[in-house]
Every structure is written in structure tokens, then in C-alpha cells.
């Protein structure tokens, strides 16, 4: 699962590819060799709406606050890297389970 990388203590980098203006919002199935996690969003990529929808989707899935997740690259691209910080220890496999459930 190359789309999720441990950056440091309780900090992960999540690589996603977004498809905007979709009928459904969600995380698409993935394989262990995927470099990107594919996510569909309902919003159009206008006035940062899709980025906000992406942040809200991820933070609800893994139950974190808004200040614990940031887009660090790809603000205006479909390929994005997000930095996720946790207050407590969480394993990589636990994080993936939360994202997929």
C-alpha cells in the first residue's frame, strides 16, 4: 500500500487521486500495489470546494479534527498528498481499515 507512508511519530502521508463532479462520494477499491488511493467527490473543482469535500470525507472516516489534516501538495491537481497527524499512536493497518470502512 504505497499510497500511505509513515512520516514520523503519529504522522502519515496519504496520496490520493480525486475524481471531481461524480455522482457518488467515496473511496474506490484498491490493491496492495497501488501508489494512489482513488476517491470520488461530488463537488466541482471550483473555489476550493473539492479540496474541502476531500478533507471532510477523510476526517469523518478516521475521526480526527480539521487541524490534524492538511493538503501539502496538489492543491490544484487531481493527485494530492495529505498529511495526517494523530494525537495517539495508530498503526498503518488500523488507519487503512478506518479509511475503507
State what each model feature region is.
Residues 59:
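The alpha-helix within a helix-turn-helix
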Residues 66-68:
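Short acidic capping loops at alpha-helix termini that bridge into adjacent secondary structure
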